[in-house]
């Protein structure tokens, strides 16, 4: 009888231990399930972050493509502007050459006019000297008359030459006036061309600044792409680690569930054995 009681006490103790282990295993199972759920939530969050990073990367790449296209357009505009500047420089050079030739013709006409004026002054002086002389000697008078005739002839010739020179001078003055008008027109064109050059220069400076900003934006996009790529790699690594953790936790849950089933079977076996023992005792 004592042996039976001891056996019953041992079986009861084993039953209590089995129930405690079962409760412990159930608690561990709940904790493992909670950890698994948290890991799944973390994996879901990481997947969302990964998707967001991929979307950000696509946006940055699209922005970089647009920036490169804009930069190519600026390069084309810069090339066209340089061509326009070269054409303007050629036009300015031709105008400067035309102006230089006009100035040479003006200097030549001025020199000829001075020479003609000097010759006319000399003839007039000689004529006045001959007219003012009073000679009593006939030979001298004849000579003077001959000289006067010659002087008059020279004066007439001088007048004729003066008229011719005056006519040529008028032509020269007309040419000079036209040259001055052309020079003024050339100066106006030069001013306009200088203004165009200034505008083109400002445009070139603006293009250079835009190109520099585009380069800076390109570097910033590259740096941002590099950062996003690193974040993407880190997120992928974390996702892989989380997936491995979930797999490990799932294995642990499966193991605990198997152990719980075994403990329940042991508990059922002990309970059946106790019931059988009680039945046997009742038979006595």
UniProtKB/Swiss-Prot annotation:
Residues 1-284 form a coiled coil. Residues 12-38 have a biased composition (Basic and acidic residues). Keywords: Acetylation, Allergen, Coiled coil, Repeat. It holds the Pfam family Tropomyosin. Tropomyosin, in association with the troponin complex, plays a central role in the calcium dependent regulation of muscle contraction. The keyword Coiled coil applies. The keyword Nucleus does not apply. Belongs to the tropomyosin family. Residues 1-42 are annotated as: Disordered. This is Tropomyosin. SUPFAM superfamilies: Tropomyosin. The modification N-acetylmethionine is found at residue 1.
């Amino acid at each position: 009888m004592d042996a039976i009681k001891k056996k019953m006490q041992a079986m009861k103790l084993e039953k209590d231990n089995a129930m405690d282990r079962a409760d412990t295993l159930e608690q561990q199972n709940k904790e493992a399930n909670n950890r698994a759920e948290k890991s799944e939530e973390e994996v879901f969050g990481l997947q969302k972050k990964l998707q967001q990073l991929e979307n950000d990367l696509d946006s940055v790449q699209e922005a970089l493509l647009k920036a490169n296209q804009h930069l190519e357009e600026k390069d084309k505009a810069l090339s066209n502007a340089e061509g326009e500047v070269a054409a303007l420089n050629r036009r300015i050079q031709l105008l400067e050459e035309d102006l230089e030739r006009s100035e040479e013709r003006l200097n030549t006409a001025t020199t000829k006019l001075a020479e003609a004026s000097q010759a006319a002054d000399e003839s007039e002086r000689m004529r006045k000297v001959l007219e003012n002389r009073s000679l009593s000697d006939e030979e001298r008078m004849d000579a003077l008359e001959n000289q006067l005739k010659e002087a008059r002839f020279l004066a007439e010739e001088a007048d004729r030459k003066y008229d011719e020179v005056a006519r040529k001078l008028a032509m020269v003055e007309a040419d000079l006036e036209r040259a001055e008008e052309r020079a003024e027109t050339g100066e106006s064109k030069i001013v306009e061309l200088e203004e165009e050059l200034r505008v083109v220069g400002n445009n070139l400076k603006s293009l250079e600044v835009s190109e520099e900003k585009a380069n800076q934006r390109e570097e910033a996009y590259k740096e941002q792409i590099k950062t996003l790529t690193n974040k993407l790699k880190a997120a992928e690594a974390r996702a892989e680690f989380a997936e491995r953790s979930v797999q490990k936790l799932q294995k642990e849950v499966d193991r605990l569930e198997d152990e719980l089933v075994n403990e329940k079977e042991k508990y059922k076996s002990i309970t059946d054995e106790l019931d059988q023992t009680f039945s046997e005792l009742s038979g006595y």
